[in-house]
């Protein structure tokens, strides 16, 4: 994820070379991986510059005020400085750095009639000849550009919001009324429909998959069915316990062959396994289940092997590479569900793991999650905490009902 935004306030209209000087400071900060927003470098022709600057003023986590003689006469710099000083009082975490350049001093700043009420001279100021030469001190004041680690739930909400926005022509106001939600206040620089989509997405995640049928009904018919289906899949993934799901991604990293994962439940092949995988690899979509076709017969290893190789051939028609070569090189995380544990003993499972070292095999254990190590399954991870079967049943039923409604659109 990108680092927090840094806003650069300046006035460069009257002094020759001032724009170039300000641009050099911006480049120095950007070169240290800061996300710097500067009007004449970032705003393009046709953009609503006023809305864009307001958005930066609201969103920035740090701001640099370049206070030159021109800036102290600028109504717009005064407006930006006022907004940022109020933000600083409300949010002490905001980094606000006055940089005094081209002869401006703390004393002259404190006596500048327009800026006196802001008391900017009481902040830790940087004094420099020009903007470019202030770069080392500004970088020290900003500190390292720490990239944000966005929680999975926030990423999921953003994804759902993007899907809601994709449903063109939908009036989210009606959805808010139906769900008895308060509409969000206006936020400068942001489309109102986008704000409503973000709030609705967070509400969906809070309610979870159990609310899917109600939400699909409220969204209405005739709306992008594929987007609604994707929303249901995300809600299903976040029903799964994160710790249990992570056993799948961790098992894939084992060497020299991926470990198998044992999961209890009653709906593994049709619902639960996909929810586990989506949560395990979130937000990546680079994973696939390989279905095991038909009955296992007497030679289980041979049957599974043939099913895997046929799936690869169907996926890559006309490929010059053999299925085994594709399996060895693909970046896609591949999984195979073994829906009946009695189909395989530890020797057969080990044979499959050796034959397909990059595939994660998932064992369905039924209602309980027994300790399989006593049965000789030495390289099997138990997906704990175990599933609550009642919760699984509710989630699967809600998911199934929601999809039935989507298919009826």
Question: What spans do the regions from the language model cover?
Answer:
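Conserved phosphate-binding/catalytic loops and adjacent sensor/switch elements of nucleotide-binding enzymes
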Residues: 269-272, 287-313, 317
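C-terminal interaction surface of TIR/SEFIR-family domains
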Residues: 1-31, 100-189, 193, 198, ...
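Conserved P-loop NTPase "ATPase switch" module shared by AAA+ and STAND
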Residues: 310-353, 365
